[in-house]
From Swiss-Prot:
It is a multi-pass membrane protein. Part of the high-affinity ATP-driven potassium transport (or Kdp) system, which catalyzes the hydrolysis of ATP coupled with the electrogenic transport of potassium into the cytoplasm. This subunit binds the periplasmic potassium ions and delivers the ions to the membrane domain of KdpB through an intramembrane tunnel. Keywords: Cell inner membrane, Cell membrane, Ion transport, Membrane, Potassium, Potassium transport, Transmembrane, Transmembrane helix, Transport. The keyword Methyltransferase does not apply. One of its GO terms (molecular function) is P-type potassium transmembrane transporter activity. The gene is kdpA. The system is composed of three essential subunits: KdpA, KdpB and KdpC. It is found in: Cell inner membrane. Belongs to the KdpA family. The chain crosses the membrane at residues 3-23, 64-84, 136-156, 179-199, 220-240, 254-274, 285-305, 330-350, 374-394, 420-440, 488-508, 527-547. Its main location: membrane. It comes from the Bacteria. This is Potassium-transporting ATPase potassium-binding subunit.
Length: 567
C-alpha cells in the first residue's frame, strides 16, 4: 500500500461526488420531460419514435401495466439475441466465418444480456461475428441499462408522488433515457476510447508476422462503441475474452481510470435524482453516504489484502504484493479498485483475474454481490436495491421507537416490508441453493478446476454473480456446459425479475398513499444516525445470510494458506 495508491482512490471518490449533482440535475430534467440543451436536436427524434410506435407520452401507466410492458420488452430482446446467434453463420459482417452458436449457449447469452448480467461462457473474438456483437449485444446493452434506470425512476415516483395510481410510462422512460442520457455520453465516450487506442472498425482481422516469423491473427472489430456502453450501462460483457484486461479494450492507465468513473457515474447521479424528486436533496446524499461507507471499506480491505500478498509468498521471500493475474500497466491499486467497483456496481467487467486474488481480496467482490450490489449498483438497479434496504431500516427504526415507520412522507407498512423482504430473500435462495447443487452434482463438479475451499468459492462466485446480474467470474470454473448454461440462466432470470416485480409493487403502493408532513416524532433520514442504521441493517442481513458460505470458502482458504496449505 502506497500514498500514490491511496491518492488514486481518493481522486476517484472526489470526482464521483463532483459528478453526482450536475448529472442528477440533468437526468431529473430529462425524466420530468423538461427542456435540456439537447432538446432542439433530440426532441423531434423522440416525438417521431412515439408517433411510429403509437405511444402517447402523456398517458401514464399503473405499476402493473408498467411492469408488464417491461417484461414484454425483455421478451423481444431475448428473441433478437437468440435469433442472431443461432443464424450467425448466414448473416453478414462475419469476417472470421464464425458458425452458429449452440442452443444452450445462445439461451444463456440471451438471458445474460437482457438481464444486464453479461455473463459470458464464450470468448467474443473466437465465437461471435461483428453483427452479433453490434445488433445483439451492444444494442441490448443500451436497452437493458435504460430499463434499469426507467425502473428506478418508477420507484422514485412512488416515493415522490401522492394519491395517484400511476408511476410513469415505461416506453417514454426507456426512450428518454436512451436518447438523452446513454447515446450522447456514449458518442463522446467512444471517441475518447478510440483516441486511447481501442479499435473501431468493420474490417477483417489483421494478419501479422511476429519477430520469430510466425503468423498471428489479431482480432479487431467495433470494440470502442461496445466498451463505452458496457461500462456506462454497467453491463460488463467484453468484446474480447480477457475483457478490460485486454489492451484493445483498456489500453492505458487513463482509459482504465475513465472506465472506472463511468461505471459509477450514473448510479451515483440517481441518488441525487431521488433527492430532487422527493423535494430534499439531502435524502439523496444520505443514500450516497451509505453507499460510500460500504465502498471505501471494501476498497481498503481488498487493497490491503492484495498489497500484503500471502504467507506462501512471504515464505518464498517475494515482496511487492500479489501481482498474479494483474496487468502491470494497472498495478495493484487500479486492479483492486476496479474489482471492488465492478462488483459494487453490478458491472462485471474485469481488468484483472479475480480468481487469482488472495482469499480475502477475492472475498470482498463476492460480498459486494451477495449484498445485492447496492453500493451504487447497476444503473437503476443499485438504487432500487438500496431503497429496499432503506425500507427495512425505517421499519426497524419504527419498531424501536414504537411509531408507524415513515420515509420521505410515506408510511412504510406491512405490504412494503413484505415486498422488500421477498426481493431480498430471492437472491440468497438462488445462489446458495444452486451452489449446493453445483458442489455435489457430478456434471457440475467436473467443471471445477480446483478442489477444496477455492473450488467451492468458484462455484459460489459463479451463482452469486449470475443471481446478482454482475457477470464477473472466478474463471477457473468451466461454465460452457449444459448444466451451467441452464442453471446460470435461471439464476440470472430470477435475480433480475423477482427483484423488479416486488420493487414495482412497492412503487405502486407508495404512489397511492397520501404524503404525511414530518412531525416531532419522525425519524430523521438525512443524518449520520440514519446512515449508520442502514449500514447496520445491510451488514446484519448480509452477515446472517452469507457468513456460513463465506466461512466454507474464502475464510477457511485464508486460514489454510496461513498454515501452509494451498489449493
Amino acid at each position: 500500500m502506497t500514498m500514490i495508491g491511496w491518492l488514486q482512490i481518493i481522486l476517484f471518490c472526489v470526482i464521483i461526488v463532483a459528478l453526482t449533482k450536475p448529472l442528477g440535475w440533468y437526468m431529473t430534467r430529462v425524466f420530468n420531460g423538461e427542456r435540456t440543451f439537447l432538446s432542439p436536436v433530440l426532441r423531434p427524434i423522440e416525438a417521431g419514435i412515439y408517433w411510429i410506435s403509437g405511444v402517447d407520452e402523456r398517458r401514464e401507466q399503473h405499476w402493473l401495466t408498467y411492469t408488464v410492458a417491461m417484461l414484454l420488452f425483455h421478451v423481444g430482446g431475448f428473441l433478437v439475441i437468440y435469433g442472431v446467434m443461432r443464424l450467425q453463420a448466414v448473416l453478414p459482417f462475419n469476417p472470421a466465418g464464425q458458425s452458429a452458436v449452440a442452443q444452450d449457449l445462445s439461451f444463456n447469452t440471451a438471458i445474460s444480456f437482457i438481464t444486464n448480467t453479461n455473463w459470458q461462457n464464450y470468448g467474443g473474438e473466437s465465437t461471435l461475428s461483428y453483427l452479433v456483437q453490434m445488433l445483439g449485444l451492444t444494442h441490448q446493452n443500451f436497452l437493458s441499462a435504460a430499463t434499469g434506470i426507467a425502473l428506478a425512476m418508477a420507484l422514485i415516483r412512488g416515493f415522490s408522488r401522492a394519491s395517484v395510481r400511476t408511476v410513469g410510462n415505461f416506453w417514454v422512460d426507456v426512450t428518454r433515457c436512451t436518447l438523452y442520457v446513454l447515446l450522447p455520453i456514449c458518442v463522446v465516450y467512444t471517441l475518447f476510447l478510440v483516441w486511447q487506442g481501442i479499435p473501431q472498425t468493420l474490417g477483417d482481422y489483421v494478419e501479422a508476422t511476429t519477430l520469430e516469423g510466425a503468423k498471428q491473427t489479431i482480432a479487431v472489430g467495433p470494440v470502442a462503441s461496445q466498451v463505452a456502453i458496457k461500462m456506462l450501462g454497467t453491463n460488463g460483457g467484453g468484446f474480447f475474452n480477457a475483457n478490460a484486461a485486454h489492451p484493445f479494450e483498456n489500453p492505458t492507465a487513463l482509459s482504465n481510470f475513465v472506465q472506472m468513473l463511468s461505471i459509477f457515474a450514473l448510479g451515483a447521479a440517481l441518488t441525487n435524482v431521488f433527492g430532487r424528486m422527493v423535494g430534499n436533496q439531502r435524502q439523496g446524499w444520505a443514500i450516497l453516504a451509505v453507499m460510500g461507507v460500504l465502498f471505501v471499506a471494501g476498497v481498503a480491505v481488498t487493497y490491503w489484502a492484495e498489497a500484503n500478498g500471502t504467507s506462501t509468498m512471504h515464505a518464498l521471500g517475494l515482496t511487492g504484493g500479489n501481482m498474479e493475474g494483474k496487468e502491470v500497466r494497472f498495478g495493484l491499486v487500479a486492479s483492486s479498485l476496479f474489482a471492488v467497483i465492478t462488483t459494487a456496481a453490478s458491472c462485471g467487467a474485469v481488468n484483472a483475474m479475480h480468481d487469482s486474488f488472495t482469499a480475502l481480496g477475492g472475498m470482498i467482490p463476492l460480498i459486494n454481490m451477495q449484498l445485492g450490489e447496492i453500493i451504487v449498483g447497476g444503473v437503476g438497479a443499485g438504487l432500487y436495491g438500496m431503497l429496499l434496504f432503506v425500507v427495512l431500516a425505517i421499519f426497524v427504526a419504527g419498531l424501536m421507537v414504537g411509531r408507524t415507520p415513515e420515509y420521505v412522507g410515506k408510511k412504510i407498512e406491512a405490504r412494503e416490508v413484505k415486498m422488500a423482504m421477498l426481493a431480498i430473500l430471492v437472491l440468497p435462495l438462488m445462489y446458495l441453493g444452486w451452489t449446493a447443487v453445483g458442489v455435489v452434482y457430478p456434471a457440475a463438479v467436473a467443471s471445477m478446476a480446483n478442489a477444496g475451499p477455492h473450488g467451492f468459492t468458484e462455484v459460489l462466485y459463479a451463482f452469486t454473480s449470475a443471481t446478482g446480474n454482475n457477470g464477473s467470474a472466478f474463471a477457473g470454473l468451466t461454465g460452457n456446459t449444459l448444466f451451467y448454461n441452464l442453471t446460470l440462466a435461471s439464476a440470472m432470470f430470477v435475480g433480475r425479475f423477482f427483484m423488479i416485480v416486488p420493487a414495482m409493487a412497492i412503487a405502486g403502493s407508495l404512489a397511492a398513499k397520501k404524503s404525511i408532513p414530518p412531525s416531532a416524532g419522525t425519524f430523521p433520514t438525512t443524518g449520520g444516525l440514519f446512515v449508520g442504521l442502514v449500514v447496520g441493517v445491510i451488514l446484519i442481513i448480509g452477515g446472517l445470510t452469507f457468513f456460513p458460505a463465506l466461512a466454507l470458502g474464502p475464510i477457511v482458504e485464508h486460514l489454510a494458506m496461513n498454515a501452509g496449505q494451498v489449493f
